[in-house]
Amino acid sequence: MDMYAVVGNPVSHSKSPKIHGMFAQQTGESLEYTAIQAPLDGFRETVESFFIGGGKGLNVTVPFKEQAWNIVSERSHRAELAGAVNTLLQRDGRLFGDNTDGEGLVRDICVNQGVALSGKKILLVGAGGAVKGVMAPLLDEGPASIVVANRTVSKAEDLARIFGRNGVVCARAFADLEGPFDVIINGTSASLAGDIPPLPDAVIASHTFTYDMMYSLRDTAFVAWAKARGAAHCCDGLGMLVEQAAAAFYLWRGVRPDTAPVLAGLRQGD
């Protein structure tokens, strides 16, 4: 039976084994998918051991996505732009890295939530690896503009410089934001700790679609903040998790699973 796994630290909380198990059952693919906690200083060795032992593919989660980018022999174009890798497989004995996070986000927003991004004013909150990983796929949708807001403005300016050739991208401090925006995407993990960045109320209106890339059993702090300010359409990142997993599954197996029943099952299970 073909072996796959997710590698992270910590990783015991990961929903990936359940998601890929549901994909395998649905598609009739014969595989086993587990979770592997790699030592913080032993990621490369963990990956090498997995593939030497006959493993077929790995998902990579926090905090190893940047390390994964560095150890591969080849990268997809989107992984190259993202500076991070979340999916590994071997091709002709060489380690290949891809990044399906941005595809997962865009598919969840555009397909599952039915929100078109073309021509929209988008606010991206945060300027870390999660935001960098989704910038190119968001720009591919043809928004009117993307504003990146971050506590450390220089980090947002770095992203604006890197991706500005692909569309209209600007950097702002939170205090300098003017709105409202059509779409606000939170790419920080702060809301899981009950915290949100100091966003002015002017950025949001009733028509604003708000999306938290994080997810939890209850509303994240960001989703609660958006609802309290009258946003009619708010969403967490569980759909992104399922969609990026489906993209990885397709890369490995050549079969694209139906994500709707898997997402519904996870929502009910939660």
Curated annotation (Swiss-Prot):
Annotated function: Involved in the biosynthesis of the chorismate, which leads to the biosynthesis of aromatic amino acids. Catalyzes the reversible NADPH linked reduction of 3-dehydroshikimate (DHSA) to yield shikimate (SA).
Keyword Flavoprotein: no
EC class of the enzyme, as a word: oxidoreductase
Pfam families: SDH_C, Shikimate_DH, Shikimate_dh_N
EC code(s) of this entry: 1.1.1.25
Protein name: Shikimate dehydrogenase (NADP(+))
Biochemical pathway: Metabolic intermediate biosynthesis; chorismate biosynthesis; chorismate from D-erythrose 4-phosphate and phosphoenolpyruvate: step 4/7
UniProt similarity note: Belongs to the shikimate dehydrogenase family.
UniProt keywords, alphabetically: Amino-acid biosynthesis, Aromatic amino acid biosynthesis, NADP, Oxidoreductase
InterPro entries: Aminoacid_DH-like_N_sf (IPR046346), NAD(P)-bd_dom_sf (IPR036291), SDH_C (IPR041121), Shikimate_DH (IPR011342), Shikimate_DH-bd_N (IPR013708), Shikimate_DH_fam (IPR022893), Shikm_DH/Glu-tRNA_Rdtase (IPR006151)
Assembly and interaction partners: Homodimer.
Residues annotated as catalytic: K65
Source organism (scientific name): Hahella chejuensis (strain KCTC 2396)
Biological process terms in GO annotation: amino acid biosynthetic process; aromatic amino acid family biosynthetic process; chorismate biosynthetic process; shikimate metabolic process
Reactions catalysed: shikimate + NADP(+) = 3-dehydroshikimate + NADPH + H(+)
Origin: domain of life: Bacteria
